[in-house]
UniProtKB/Swiss-Prot annotation:
Residues 65-102 have a biased composition (Basic residues). A lipid is attached at residues 706, 716, 736-737 (S-palmitoyl cysteine). Keywords: Capsid protein, Cleavage on pair of basic residues, Disulfide bond, Eukaryotic host gene expression shutoff by virus, Eukaryotic host transcription shutoff by virus, Fusion of virus membrane with host endosomal membrane, Fusion of virus membrane with host membrane, Glycoprotein, Host cell membrane, Host cytoplasm, Host gene expression shutoff by virus, Host membrane, Host nucleus, Host-virus interaction, Hydrolase, Lipoprotein, Membrane, Palmitate, Phosphoprotein, Protease, RNA-binding, Serine protease, T=4 icosahedral capsid protein, Transmembrane, Transmembrane helix, Viral attachment to host cell, Viral penetration into host cytoplasm, Virion, Virus entry into host cell. PROSITE patterns: ALPHAVIRUS_CP. One of its GO terms (molecular function) is serine-type endopeptidase activity. Residues 82-112 are annotated as: Binding to the viral RNA. This is Structural polyprotein. A motif (Nuclear localization signal) lies at residues 66-70.
Length: 1240
């Protein structure tokens, strides 16, 4: 029962029920109160009643409500003296997520449902667009009764299961979008970056159990569903499912990605299976059981959860690290430094505590990574960034990192250090030296390695610039975190330690350090060997008769070819390589802009490079004619530019394209000398031939009349009758032989036929009558079959209203006029925005730089060993007998000649392969796609994607468009191409498995992470030198590096027709080759009947200014007088003229000025405004600019190239000369006839 309410005021006195009451009490008169006072009093009483009588009962007993800051309850006075114990220190709360992340988490929590398997979350299913999507690789049941009852369909190609959600849930689902501009998006773990068509997150963000989570944009729409991921350097690439613009699902899976279902990966330890993130001996770790921990890691070397097991072994202690940096440093506490052979210690060969194992210089800007036998950032007792450790004999010693120095031709700058590795910025040199000072002792090691500054881009600068342009490059990351690359470790082999042996009581005594084990080997005279953990006395009397080996199984060492391998079956471990090559952005120099000078069809570049700079050019026509030259000093270069265009690229500047215009210095419409100057600049050879012809005609015309008159004068002076034996001229004789003739008229012909041949007379008479009958029959057939024929033609026209052929040139529109009987013409414009030739490709293999792996050799003292086959690429193994190795100054074996050494070597991918590799593709016939802008009538459609195959129709609004196929089946790609970085090369590479040493393809694999590695590097093992533990070998240089030096120019620099080569997918864009047939079906709604078309009267077109072959260089004025003010269309009937604007409002009375582009000297085009038409004529001048940065229109016809003025002058010239010739001939004939008649 709930308690009664407690009253906080004193109770009233009890009333006596038997008290006397007057039955007729006197009536009391209430005192007079003003109305306002009475109202106030009533209000006061009502408030008092509410506060006293309407008290709420106490709340029932139950859990208190959650509050951020609960109010303290009142306590009695005695309780104030006793202070409660201080509350436990609460952990610092994580910062609240941002607004976008909160919205993302809210939407995800409402629309995403976990998939349960064995009581734990294995993945997620999300509801998008009225459907539920569940990853196919995620097993389990959706944690929702309604969704779990849905029957899902499988789409294995997308790794998804999907089904329609119930009707009650369709209004509460997420919406998807195909718009994915580059930038950042949201998901459960924060921001996701989308760049280069890939979703990436920082490494370590997301993982197992996140499959099925959605990626949202700022509006809460789903852009992708996560399926898995793969680590790529410092970031993780996500495998996702997205949607394209047509709403079709698209799967994007990077190479090597793994599904992110929360499937527990198991590891093994001595026949015990356990989760890799929970070793069976938890909370034991490396500090407590070092040997067992190393053994556990070695047995799970090939497990895909090796990183989890390593992390659990290193972080198993409860002590919290200060920062994540120290956490990754603690991985190398499993290893120790060592002493190894160095070829040059400053004086000679020696066993050095800082021997150089490897030098890598594959990054740009002169950064190298050095691996040594010393360790950096570690002390003997823990992690310390300011110290380095090395082996001082048999003990480990630490000194300050300031004592370390690195140099090539000059001292290097130390960038970072970690584990066995140093990252340094070095000047160019042929050798690398690493050393340190330990008090008075100085240790150095020098190896031969060429260090050079590798510039980025097309300019050979020698120092990093202060400013410039950012270009992709390769760099070594400075992070020490897990980057996905490993260095191989193993437990060290046995090394003789003579300090463990001593003479005690004339016997050899073996002293064992505390907590260690020693293996001994004695020969006095019988051979005795064993392992002891306490002091042991042998029967030998001389220290030389025994060898003692300290068993060091608590630390790993690098699996070096300069260290002997341990006896028996030795397992391997691995640690992360700290500084790995990654893709980055580097600042490259930008050469000074060239000084450009334009002349007629000539481009002059004045170049002033600061350092050697590459200049490349190519023609944009069918013959690319590429050039490539390095400019080292200021110079001037000239290039011929044609109407097809020229592209030049100077240094790291973007490529520029220029086109020649039909410019000239003269005037094609001026005086003859101006016409000659104009055509001489434009067509020099043709002009010279024409001038020579005209001069020859003039000379002949002048010489012939003079000779004729001289001959006539001679004939007139010497008549025929006075000359003896005179002969008649041949011309007069021929004229005399001609018989005069006379033609009869029609009546005489008919009279002759009637009298001589009446049959032929009637035949001639009936011919006109037969022709009249045939014409009448044709007209009758037209009346009978004409309507049906027109209907058929109308149906055909409705199916494809307009067909034409347009040039395959981007940016130059095709314009036409579509006419229909009874309708106003409709303007049609089709412009190519982008074209792509996309071939089908097949990846044969990838190739990259290899790395030779040399394991520790097996040294068998006083015995023999043998090689075994191992599945490694280009694996080489050889046993050498009669070796006598020394180890750190002492003999390693008893025997002199009976010892054997087994040397091994093989090839593997270098660490740079993940970012620096080439892909070999076989190319087959592909497809052609285009993006077009279409305008018909008042309808405009932008960026429509169509297939240029002549078969696939594209829906453009209510119109249907079919484009293609191309008139020329051409492609810039050969049958084999190589993709390297962002460039594509036509290269005839060898087939898979047939690579040759030292050439392209000496290292091959299907993907960058696959195990099908093929190598042919001519690897040969050499006999080791006496007294040194090492594995010498010879090998051919990397064929990939050789190909990079000799690869030549990429397709972007040599492809004809101005093609631009792009990737993802491989394609050639905007190739101006051939022509494209088009066919478009225009709907009836786009046509306007003539009765509804506005009319315009009094049209007159006047060209006020015109420059041909220029970008809308013509200006014309059109006086108009429309019936009513409307917006009308202007329609051109010619193709060589283009209007800048096709629609404009026309006023009641006034004029309209429009711009047009033409390639003719004398433009004469018909312009139609509504139903009225007018012809525009005029003269155009040549353009003043010789070179422009846009493609200009050029005419190729002879009649259009020669102006009317030039034709007029030519006619006058030829016409005057002909007149003189004709007059001379007539005079000659007259004189000859007169003389002839006088003679006879």
């Amino acid at each position: 029962m709930f308690p009664y309410p407690t009253l906080n005021y004193p109770p009233m006195a009890p009333i006596n029920p038997m008290a006397y009451r007057d039955p007729n009490p006197p009536r009391q008169v209430a005192p007079f109160r003003p109305p306002l006072a009475a109202q106030i009093e009533d209000l006061r009483r009502s408030i008092a009643n509410l506060t006293l009588k309407q008290r709420a009962p106490n709340p029932p007993a139950g859990p208190p409500a959650k509050r951020k800051k609960p109010a303290p309850k009142p306590k009695p006075a005695q309780a104030k003296k006793k202070r409660p114990p201080p509350p436990a220190k609460k952990q610092k709360r994580k910062p609240k997520p941002g607004k976008r992340q909160r919205m993302c988490m809210k939407l995800e929590s409402d629309k995403t449902f976990p998939i349960m398997l064995n009581g734990q979350v294995n993945g997620y299913a999300c509801v998008v667009g009225g459907r539920v999507f569940k990853p196919l690789h995620v097993e389990g049941r959706i944690d929702n009764e309604q969704l779990a009852a849905i029957k899902l369909k499988k789409a294995s190609i997308y790794d998804l299961e999907y089904g329609d959600v119930p009707q009650c849930m369709k209004s509460d689902t997420l919406q998807y979008t195909s718009d994915k501009p580059p930038g950042f998006y949201n998901w459960h773990h924060g921001a996701v970056q989308y760049e280069n068509n890939r979703f990436t997150v920082p490494r370590g963000v997301g993982g197992k159990g996140d499959s099925g989570r959605p990626i949202l944009d700022n509006k809460g729409r789903v852009v992708a569903i996560v399926l898995g991921g793969v680590n790529e350097g410092s970031r993780t690439a996500l495998s996702v499912v997205t949607w394209n613009q047509k709403g079709v699902t698209v799967k994007d899976t990077p190479e090597g990605s793994e599904p992110w279902s929360l499937a527990t990966v198991m590891c093994v330890l001595a026949n015990i299976t356990f989760p890799c993130d929970q070793p069976p001996c938890m909370p034991c770790c490396y500090e407590k059981n070092p040997h067992e921990t190393l053994t556990m890691l070695e047995q799970n070397y090939d497990s895909r959860a090796y990183d989890q097991l390593l992390d659990a072994a290193v972080k198993c202690n409860a002590r919290r690290t200060r920062r994540d940096l120290d956490t990754h440093f603690t991985q190398y506490k499993l290893a120790r430094p060592y002493i190894a052979d160095c070829p040059n210690c400053g004086h000679s060969r020696c066993d050095s505590p800082i021997a150089i194992e490897e030098v890598r210089g594959d990054a740009h800007a002169g950064v190298i990574r050095i691996q040594t036998s010393a360790m950096f950032g570690l002390k003997t007792d823990g992690v310390d960034l300011a110290y380095m450790s090395f082996m001082n004999g048999k003990t480990q010693k630490s000194i300050k990192i300031d004592n370390l120095h690195v140099r090539t031709s000059a001292p290097c700058s130390l960038v970072s250090h970690h584990g066995y590795y140093i990252l340094a910025q070095c000047p160019p040199g042929d050798t690398v030296t690493v050393g340190f000072h330990d008090g008075p002792n100085r240790h150095t090691c020098t190896v031969a390695h060429k260090v050079e500054f590798r510039p980025v881009g097309r300019e050979k600068y020698r120092h990093p610039p202060e400013h410039g342009v950012e270009l992709p490059c390769n760099r070594y990351t400075h992070k020490r975190a897990d980057q996905g690359h490993y260095v191989e470790m193993h437990q060290p082999g046995l090394v003789a330690d003579h300090s463990l042996l001593s003479i005690h009581s004339a016997k050899v005594k073996i002293t064992v350090p505390s907590g260690a084990q020693v293996k001994y080997y004695c020969k006095c005279p019988d051979v005795r060997e064993g392992i002891t953990s306490s002091d042991h006395t042998t029967t030998c009397t001389d220290v030389k008769q025994c060898r003692a080996y300290l068993i060091g199984n608590k630390k790993w060492v690098y699996n070096s070819g300069r260290l002997p391998r341990g006896e028996g079956d030795t397992f391997k471990g691995k640690l992360h390589v700290p500084f790995v090559p990654v893709k980055a952005k580097c600042i490259a120099t930008l050469a000074p802009e060239p000084l450009v000078e334009h002349k007629h069809r000539t481009l002059i570049l004045h170049l002033h490079p600061d350092h050697p700079t590459l200049l490349t050019t190519r023609s944009l026509g069918s013959d690319a004619n590429p050039t490539r030259q390095w400019i080292e000093r200021p110079t001037t270069v000239n290039f011929t530019v044609t109407g097809e265009g020229l592209e030049y690229t100077w240094g790291n500047h973007p490529p520029k394209r220029v086109w020649a215009q039909e410019s000239g210095e003269g005037n094609p419409h001026g005086w003859p000398h101006e016409v000659v100057v104009y055509y001489y600049n434009r067509y020099p050879l043709t002009t010279i031939i024409g001038l020579c012809t005209c001069v020859a005609i003039i000379m002949v015309s002048c010489v012939h009349p003079c000779g004729s008159f001289a001959g006539l004068r001679n004939l007139c002076i010497t008549p025929y009758k006075l000359a003896p034996n005179a002969q008649v001229p041949i011309l007069l004789a021929l004229l005399c032989c001609i018989k005069p003739t006379r033609a009869d008229d029609t009546l005489q012909v008919l009279n002759y036929l009637w009298n001589n041949n009446q049959n032929f007379f009637w035949m001639q008479t009936l011919i006109p009558l037969a022709a009249l009958i045939v014409c009448m029959r044709i007209v009758r057939c037209l009346f009978c079959c004409g309507p049906a024929f027109l209907l058929v033609c109308g149906a055909w026209a409705a199916a494809y209203e307009h067909t034409a052929v347009m040039p395959n040139k981007v940016g130059i529109p095709y314009k036409a006029l579509v006419e229909r009987p009874g309708y106003a013409p409709v303007h049609l414009q089709i412009q190519l925005v982008n074209t792509s030739i996309i071939p089908s490709t097949n990846l044969e293999y990838i190739t990259c730089k290899y790395k030779t792996k040399v394991p520790s050799p097996v040294v068998k003292c006083c015995g023999a060993t043998q090689c075994t086959s191992k599945p490694h690429p280009d694996y080489q193994c050889q046993v050498f007998t009669g070796v006598y190795p020394f180890m750190w100054g002492g003999a390693y074996c008893f025997c002199d000649t009976e010892n054997t050494q087994m040397s091994e070597a093989y090839v593997e991918r270098s660490e740079e392969c993940s970012i620096d590799h080439a892909k070999a593709y076989k190319v087959h016939t592909g497809t052609v796609q285009a993006m077009v802008n279409i305008t018909y009538g008042s309808v405009s459609w932008r960026s429509a994607d169509v297939y240029v195959n002549g078969e696939t129709p594209a829906k453009i609004g209510d119109a249907k468009l079919i484009i293609g196929p191309l008139s020329s089946a051409w492609s810039p790609f050969d049958n084999k191409v190589v993709v390297y970085g962002h460039e594509v090369y036509n290269y005839d590479f060898p087939e898979y498995g047939t690579g040759k040493a030292g050439s392209f393809g000496d290292l091959q694999s299907r993907t960058s992470t696959s195990n099908d590695l093929y190598a042919n590097t001519n690897l040969k093992l050499q006999r080791p030198q006496a007294g040194i533990v090492h594995t010498p070998f010879t090998q051919a240089p990397s064929g990939f590096e050789r190909w990079k030096r000799d690869k030549g120019a990429p397709l972007n620099d040599v492809a004809p027709f101005g093609c631009s080569i792009a990737l993802e997918p491989l394609r050639a864009e905007n190739c101006a080759v051939g022509s494209i047939p088009i066919s478009i079906d225009i709907p009836d709604a786009a046509f306007t009947r003539i009765s509804e078309t506005p009319t315009v009267s009094d049209l007159e077109c006047k060209i006020t200014e015109c420059t041909y072959a220029s970008d809308f260089g013509g200006i014309a004025t059109l006086p108009t007088n429309p019936v009513k003010q409307e917006t009308v269309q202007f329609i051109l009937h010619q193709v060589l003229q283009l209007l800048k604007r096709m629609t404009s409002p026309l006023l009641r009375a006034g004029s309209f000025t429009f711009h047009f582009s033409t390639a003719n000297i004398h433009p004469a085009f018909k312009l139609q405004v509504c139903t009225s038409g007018v012809t525009c004529k005029g003269d155009c001048k040549p353009p003043k600019d010789h070179i422009v940065d846009y493609p200009a229109q050029h005419t190729e016809s002879f009649t259009s190239a020669i102006s009317a003025t030039a034709w007029s002058w030519l006619k006058v010239l030829v016409g005057g000369t002909s007149a003189f010739i004709v007059l001379g001939l007539i005079a000659t004939a007259v004189v000859a006839l007169v003389l002839f008649f006088h003679r006879h």
